[in-house]
Amino acid sequence: MKRAQSLSVVKRNQMLLEQIKEIKTDHPLWGYRRIWSYLKYRQGIAVNKKRIYRIMKEQNLIVTQLVRLKARRGPMHPKPHADHPNHFWGIDMTKIKLASWGWLYLTVVLDWHTKEIIGHSLSLRSKTDDWLDALHMAVNNRFPNGIQSDMKEQLFLISDNGCQPTSQRFMMNCSLLGIKQIFTTWSNPKCNSDTERVMRTIKEDIIWCYDWDHPFNFEVAINKWINDYNNDFPHQALNNMTPTQFYEHFLSKNNQPVLT
């Protein structure tokens, strides 16, 4: 027979449940591992991962994994591995449906090593200029003294074969900046998987869960989300540090000034 929980355990679980529900309000598709990581490493709450799982399961808050049919493709090549910041960046775009405006396009640049979103742009179009705006933001963030003087090793930019990253102007800009482009193929979609995973997180957290009716409202929301993602979301792949913490840790470990 299952032993009844003590009053202190019941109170503790109730407190944790309220905190879990608060997180799930903003991030309804977060699983128990990510919620546990956020509670422990960002809010400083000492709690066992199994306890979070048990509470969420009892309250039907566990995210159900959908079974998806996968297209058959040719042999997969291993995806690139970023050994340090500014080694591999990824760039990708997604679109947001606005009730009375049509489509809004979000372009994002991600540093694969730190998982940090270092550049982004929003536009009612989907033009090469928008991709260049996101890329130039990333360059200015990471190379404030100029990319030619600050870049120590070759920087690669991974993208799909869309008309924007393959346009003559975009490719010429990358060449002038000293950035080498890598293009994914249909048979090797994992080549830009880190960037696509972040785009999926954006969709889960802020696009699919809300009905957006004005570009300004979404702009405010995405700017806040990116700031929270970079500075407040711990990543298991980063030893439960945030992207900003991980980047600053790398700089301090290698005796490089922390950018502010």
Question: Which role does the model predict for each range below?
Answer:
Residues 102, 120-148:
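Active-site beta-loop-alpha junctions of metal-dependent nucleic acid enzymes
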Residues 147-166, 241-244:
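Acidic/histidine-rich, metal-coordinating catalytic segments
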Residues 88-118, 124-126:
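An active-site-proximal beta-strand-loop segment
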Residues 65-70, 156-161, 175-194, 211-214:
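RNase H-like polynucleotidyl transferase catalytic core
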Residues 1-88, 188-189, 244-251:
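Basic, flexible linker segments flanking DNA-binding modules
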Residues 6, 175-179, 201-260:
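C-terminal domain-tail junction helix/linker
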